[in-house]
Amino acid sequence: QMIYQLRDGHIVLESPFNRYQYYDWYQSDYNSNLINANYLNYQLQEGQTGVYSYGRIQDILYVHLASFKGQKKPFIELAQIIEASNNTTSGIILDLRTNGGGSDVNAHLIAKEFINNFIRIRWIRYRNGPDHYAYSRWISNELTPKQHNYKRPVVIITDRSVFSAAEDFVLALRQLPNVFVVGQFTGGGSGNPMTRELPNGWIIKVPRWQVADPLTKELYEGIGLEPDVILMQRTLDTTLGIDRVLDFSINYINNLNDN
């Protein structure tokens, strides 16, 4: 009950006999079976370890980024897929629904595929004392662009299940002129927990920093990142075999290319 009061999935208490963590996350409206059947003609391909899947919708590359957890290898593979699609697609849809985070190194590895200038991606400050406002000075984090970046329209789909490193990914890309974010607010949890052993041998993990928007320096903890357009899947949409957020994303890219 003590852990649940904090409503933060980055806080974990581990004992030899149990693990205590906040699990009452927001439910995602992502439906992989619906998308695979009705949008990808059952041609959805899964990457290594299942952290991403992808396919073509018309001439748009669709990527579901399920997680940023694990080793770098699958994300290097995905980066190569994105780079190879630069001249063969009219746009990319990056679906982050269900992505609860993972490694910001992996998130930034993919983000680099889209930036063409040296950019600030976030401000961070670390907890450094017991007082309520005991934090370090703000530290700027930047990303260096790749030589060849994806230049066509990009739509990112978010909902309340998007947390942590996945929010880092959104923070980095949403400032780009060719990137549009649609869906719902993200979950609002930056985390970066540190691990400590208690005197009784139990292990506790607690968040140790705050992350702020790279442009406004606004905090989003407990609030989330607002999309450019708020759009939610309805029960009727699912019954009809429609993903209205994905439909919007497809039409958005097609309309840009028609103009």
Question: Where are the model-predicted features located?
Answer:
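Flexible, low-complexity junctional segments that flank or bridge functional domains
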Residues: 1-126, 131-139, 197, 203, ...
